[in-house]
């Protein structure tokens, strides 16, 4: 599926077309995994209201599904002709990197640290703050890049009636400036969330109460 990243380059057309076909095929196993992950919670969805760690893990699976839908869609040549080399690709990658990989890593750390140190998690309230601050940050980040990327693609392919480019490259860069501000704000919020997690885990290890139970019981808050 890798050649779909090289549409409209020196790579032979047949190779990129083959990559597109395999990329579209990846919808099935990717969404099979996502559906399997979400349906594991069947009958226990009420836990999402009280367990922010579980909520973070479930949202990571949702971001995985969104990212793995968007990737094959962007591999289709008619879509890629607009998205290629634009910020849309950056938005797509970061919906997976921050939303999927980031959140599943955070959730794993929130589970593993109390288990490894046999401590109660210092504060579920801080986990909840981490979840919402980081989620807002991710949404701001990727939404700004989606809009920025589509705008870039449309500006780059706009021609005058005489066949000249309607916008210069620097005009397209200037048009991106507001979206880059939003992107920076989103990234800063995501970082703040990660710092909250670092503090929470540090306090869990150094000031958390010893857990009387093994495994998942250690996820009960100490406060």
How should each PLM-predicted stretch be described?
Residues 82-85, 177:
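Short hydrophobic "helix-edge" motifs at membrane interfaces and signal-peptide entry regions
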């Amino acid at each position: 599926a890798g050649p779909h990243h090289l549409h409209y380059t020196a790579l032979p057309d047949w190779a990129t077309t083959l990559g597109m076909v395999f990329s579209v095929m990846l919808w099935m196993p990717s969404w099979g995994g996502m559906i399997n992950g979400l349906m594991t919670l069947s009958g226990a969805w009420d836990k999402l209201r009280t367990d922010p760690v579980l909520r973070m893990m479930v949202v990571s699976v949702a971001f995985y599904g969104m990212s793995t839908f968007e990737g094959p869609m962007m591999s289709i040549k008619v879509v890629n002709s607009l998205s290629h080399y634009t910020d849309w690709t950056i938005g797509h990658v970061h919906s997976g990197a921050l939303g999927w990989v980031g959140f599943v890593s955070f959730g794993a750390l929130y589970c593993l640290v109390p288990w490894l140190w046999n401590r109660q998690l210092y504060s579920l309230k801080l986990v909840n703050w981490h979840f919402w601050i980081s989620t807002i940050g991710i949404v701001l980040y990727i939404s700004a890049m989606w809009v920025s990327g589509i705008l870039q693609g449309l500006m780059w392919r706009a021609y005058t009636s005489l066949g000249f480019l309607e916008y210069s490259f620097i005009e397209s860069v200037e048009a991106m400036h507001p979206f880059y501000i939003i992107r920076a704000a989103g990234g800063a919020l995501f970082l703040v969330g990660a710092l909250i997690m670092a503090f929470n885990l540090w306090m869990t290890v150094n000031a958390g109460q010893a857990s009387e139970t093994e495994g998942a019981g250690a996820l009960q808050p100490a406060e």
